[in-house]
Amino acid sequence: MKWSNVNSNDSEVVKQSLVVSKSCGASQQTSDITVQVGPAGTIKATKDSSTAIQNLASYMTNAASCGTTILLSKAGDSVAALYAGADVYQSDVGPYLLNFKKQFKAGSQIIQSCDSSSKRDNTIGVYIVNSLDDLEGIDRALQTWSKGSCLDSDGHDLIQSKTTMLGVSEVSKRSDISSSLEGFLAPRAEDNFDKYNTGTDLCKNLKVKQRVCCSAGSLPDIIPKKQSDGTCGTYTIQTNDNCAEIAAHFGVTQDDIYDLNEDTWGWAGCGTNDLKADQVICLSEGNTPMPSPLSNAVCGPQMPDEFCTESPARTKAPGAFQSGKNGCISNCGTYIVNNDDAPENFYHVAYFEVFNLKRECLNMDVNEISDTSLTHVHFAFAGLTADFDVSFDNDEYKAQFEKFVKNDASYKRILSFGGWAESTSASTFQRYRDAVKSGNREKFAKNIKAFFEKYDGLDGIDFDWEYPGATDIPGVPAGSDSDDDNYLGFLKLMKSTIGDKSLSIALPASYWYLKTFPIAKMSDYVSYFIYMTYDLHGQWDYNNAYADVGCPSGDCLRSHVNKTETINSLAMITKAGVPASKIFVGVSSYGRSFGMVDPTCTGPMCKYGGAFDVSTAEAGSCTNTSGYISNAELNLIMQGVDSGASNYKGRTWYDEDSASDVMIYGTKGEITTWVAYMSDDTKEARIDWIKGLNFGGVTDWAIDLQELNLGVDPDSDEAQDLDLPALPTGCSSANWPDNLEDLRNKIDKIDLGCRAQAVVWVLIKILPDILDNYQSAADNYDEYFKYYAEWVRNGIDDSLPLFMWSDGQNYMDCKWSSTSDGSGDAACTEMHVPEGQPGQGEVSITYTVRDEDGFYKALQADYGIEKDWIVWKDIYADPENSLTCPPCPNLTKDCKPCTGHGVTYHNWPVKAADDDIDVPNLKDIIDTAVPNITTLQDVILGSFIEMRIGAMDASDEDVATALSMPVFMIADTTEQMKNITKIGKEQEKADDEAKVSFILDIVSIVLMIIPFAGEAVDAIGGVANVARAAYVVGEAGNAALSVYDIVKNPSSAPFAILGLVMGADASVVGKASKTTFTKAAAFRNALTEDTLSSFSKEFRANDAIVQDIVKACKRA
């Protein structure tokens, strides 16, 4: 476009020309797009980040550049990066960004419109970091977008939007071919192209490597054909291949590729990073191909040279093979087999970890097992003595077992032996190797038989020897080649010994450990196998090149309950000759967790840290093991996140690829940990799937990890002592209100035993908003204190005469003279002289402080005035002309007596100069209280968790009573802070009543938060110094002084309660003391009605709701 051809006097023409120039000469079209928005709360300084986005939007709105745009904008500490692809109408990016103001203000880090399968460069991406220290994240995001890929969007929200795209004017990999060909081909060539290629919309859908005609005729049939042996037509993936280009090159569609490869080895789809170099895929109908061999594979279809390869001898005789070959082996393919018939019954096993009692919390008594869906419960674990008899670690575990076999349960009661710890401990591992040997197994079997006779309620035994024949368990000598045969012989003898009692063993889902088990033969003697299809991945994968597909270093984030890998494991065991009906497939009630190297990277190629035996994952508060965390703990962490608890961060999502749930979390202010697990819904879906495959049942590790329990036998004396029978075994918070008013109105719908917990739940829900409002209000208080200090100083002159005409005279001597009534010299209380009377004549009074210590103490106590705040001067007062001749501050030539009937006061106290009066800045107390309020938030959440898991050694009612008082105090303070009107310059003319009210409000606020401020109060002279302003400007009985009466004693209820609960370390689950909350509740309960009346109406109303609820609970 040339401006010489534009009529610059025509504004519409100029405007249209500018629009065309901004589109770089290309056509424009409005496109519907899907925008992926990252989770809220990732970015902290949302005000700064929003400003950075506004700057980017402003620049882009006024930009007229062509091609790809990459911009960075910094505001405060936040840095925002923008990527806008070459096919995006750049000037429309600004308004597009402003559509997401709400998401940016909420703290979203990533917003991207991105399609990695598109051939156009139409990505719009924004990536924000909290500081310059995090620029690596921006670099990674920009590189990803510039390569045509997209950032991981797991857990992102999807929002439909619109923006303007361009038709580009040059051919490129990502260009729109239909518009690019115009002008690219010479007119004659373009005519020929259309002549030889007549397909509808061909240009619009052209792909790289797609074949077209350059002459008359038709294209050859290039679709691969089925091979002569029935194998499909294959293609070997090359580096940087993608499905779109492969489909175009071979004349098929991407949908065809998906359909043809549903059963192909290693097929993961067409997504980013899904195709692997050297992977073999199908491009036609036919049998699935053999995968490419791996030189280091020792089994399976990728083992070099042989899998399902026929190699008959030259004679072709049956069973005769070429030298060194095995022929077509029996386990060809990757399908689950031996599952044609459904079992007679589908069973549901759960393990009970008796060692849960060693945990500091999340305890469960064996009599708390109440799941009616269970058909078997395995009591884990018993051990072996040196002479092959049954043992328990301690008397407590044995007592639990004896209750287990005596209870009247609907499920089968099975005792499990071994486990990982006993199988690998230096003191016990050899016992399992020896017990199954031919010389010992009979003795062991007899001992087991005697054990059954002693405990006739026992229905079976289960052996969890981990693992016979294993050679790589750290700290354990390599197993013997005879372990497998010994184990088989032992099982054969054990089955004949125990008769119709149940016999089962646990099997690993790993080929390396399973290969030593003669499982096909074992299946003749066991009732079922416990197949541990959990722990498929864990910290032990670290630095293992064979642990994670596509992850040579073994340190990639992978799910330990991955469904695809579970399928492979099930194929492995069924192909080994075990009928599906005898296999109980593992599901889990815990997660395997990893410390993330990059908390923003959550996909299967992202890395975790640590070492083979060192996990950097955040440990659960009860299981207390990095890398392993219970579902119950994960649920509690998300409760903390959902309730806005300080330092709790996290989010969850369902991962389709692994068919498992994923959570990232951190409880110390930052997300640090990735964990894969099964939620209840996921577990139910997995169980239904397993049942549909005709397996015999499922086995769940472990029932005590699922949810919170009391950890006490409901029928025991201990339960009676703790008054536990009245408590329900679980309090669901799903429908609890999140404010006190609704809680009071709906309290009848909540079980009595759960109501105190519901109170604490409400405290958790309301405290974040209280804290936010407190901090917001506190931001304006620097301005407020300027007026506060000024008005306190101005009140001194009003208060001094009141003191001098009352208690002040008790500490002074007077010398006086009067023209009408003589003179004298005595204590001021005995002075007789006319003052303030018409016609009195001239009066002169000189004051001398007799008891200086008593004078200043009384002045401070009664009126809050410090010694340094006054000076002693001579002043004059005229009673006859007070309206026109006010009292003179001193006798100077500028202030002469107005009449002959005044009074001269010598050595009279007056306000010192403003600069000499240091009014404490109470803002310091307001600011200092914030960290302690935040800590209180953590304490309440920690206490709630203890209540939920049954680790709180105190009554729920005492906990609710103790925690509510400090919350209501800070809530009351916040409301007062919000209600103080911002003081502007016009308020300098406020009347005296308004000024006094303002000062008293501020003093009341600060006094109420003093229990939260700690040493900051001492820095300004203590509580009395805070209250001083109320004495200077107020009067006895004002509201501020009533609050002062509450908090002036360090042992009063607010101080005592806060000190107890803040010192309880309740933010660490299991650490709270029963006496802590009992004592704190006692301080609240000891408050009299008179004392309570000193608190605000709102405080008393909230407190009354809590008291009514907890008293009803105690009466029940």
Swiss-Prot record:
GO terms for biological process: chitin catabolic process; polysaccharide catabolic process. It comes from the Eukaryota. InterPro entries: Chitinase_II/V-like_cat, Chitinase_insertion_sf, Glyco_hydro18_cat, Glyco_hydro_18_chit_AS, Glycoside_hydrolase_SF, LysM12-like, LysM_dom, LysM_dom_sf. Chitin binds at residues 467, 701. One of its GO terms (molecular function) is chitin binding. Its EC number is 3.2.1.14. It catalyses: Random endo-hydrolysis of N-acetyl-beta-D-glucosaminide (1->4)-beta-linkages in chitin and chitodextrins. Residues 346-719 form the GH18 domain. Keywords: Carbohydrate metabolism, Chitin degradation, Chitin-binding, Glycosidase, Hydrolase, Polysaccharide degradation, Virulence. Residues 233-283 form the LysM domain. In plants, chitin acts as a microbe-associated molecular pattern (MAMP) that is recognized by lysin motif (LysM)-containing plant cell surface-localized pattern recognition receptors (PRRs) that activate a plethora of downstream immune responses. Belongs to the glycosyl hydrolase 18 family. Chitinase class V subfamily. The LysM (lysin motif) domains are small globular domains involved in binding chitin in eukaryotes. LysM11 contains one LysM domain. Probable chitinase involved in the degradation of chitin, a component of the cell walls of fungi and exoskeletal elements of some animals (including worms and arthropods). Might be involved in manipulation of host defenses for successful infection. This is Probable chitinase LysM11.
